[in-house]
C-alpha cells in the first residue's frame, strides 16, 4: 500500500508511480457489536438522567452537541474534502493566511445564511404542522430514527438514505475571486440538502428542527450543525500541506463512520427511553 506521503517524496523525473490506495481496514464485527451495545447502554442511561432533569436545558444541550458533532462528521463527505482542499491560502506564511481570512469569513457567512434559510423553512413547517416541542411522540420518532441509522452506520442494517449526489461546482473557482467562492461554497453547503452529506445525523437534526415548531429554535439547530461543518476549514490557516490533511481524513474514514454510528445509537436509545418513561 502506498501512502500519499510516500508519493509526495518521489522524484519529478520518475515516469510512473504505483496507484495510491487509502482504504482503511473496516472494524471487525466484534468491534461494531461492542460499539453498538456500549452506545445503547450509555444512551439509555442518559435518557434516564434527562427524565429526572429540571427543565429542557439538558435536552437542548444534548441536541446542540449532537448537531455540532454531525457537522464535524460531515467533513468525511465529498464536499468536506473539497472545501478544505479548494479554499486554501495562496502561498504560505502569515501574509498568505491574512489574505485568506476574507475567504474564511465569507465561507462562514454563507453557512450562516444557509442556516437562516433552511432553519427558517423547517421551523415554519413545524409551526404550520402544529408541533410545539419535544413531547413523547416527537422523542420516540427521533429515537427510532437514531437507532435505525445507528445500526445502518455500524453496518448491521440497510436503511434508505436519500441524498442529492452532487458536490459544489469546482469550475466556479475559475470564474470568481476566492472570497466569492468561499461564500458560494458556504451557502451551498449550509443549505445541507443541495450536496451529499454522509452523516444521517442531518436527518435527526432536520426532524428536531421541525418538531420545535419554532423558527428561532430551528435556525439554532441548523446553525450548530453548520458550525460543525464550517470549523474544519480553519485547518487551512495552519502550516500543514493539503495532501497531509486529505491523507489524514482518508485514514480515519472508517473511524468517523464508527463514531457516527455510536452517536446515532446513543441518541436513539436516550430519546426512546426518555419518551417511554
UniProtKB/Swiss-Prot annotation:
Top-level taxon of the source organism: Bacteria
Membrane topology category: Multi-pass membrane protein
Organism in which the protein naturally occurs: Paracoccus denitrificans
UniProt protein name: Methylamine utilization protein MauF
Transmembrane segments: 33-53, 59-79, 111-131, 132-152, 179-199, 205-225, 257-277
Pathway connected to this protein: One-carbon metabolism; methylamine degradation
GO cellular component: plasma membrane
Record keywords: Cell membrane, Membrane, Transmembrane, Transmembrane helix
Gene encoding the protein: mauF
Places the protein is found: Cell membrane
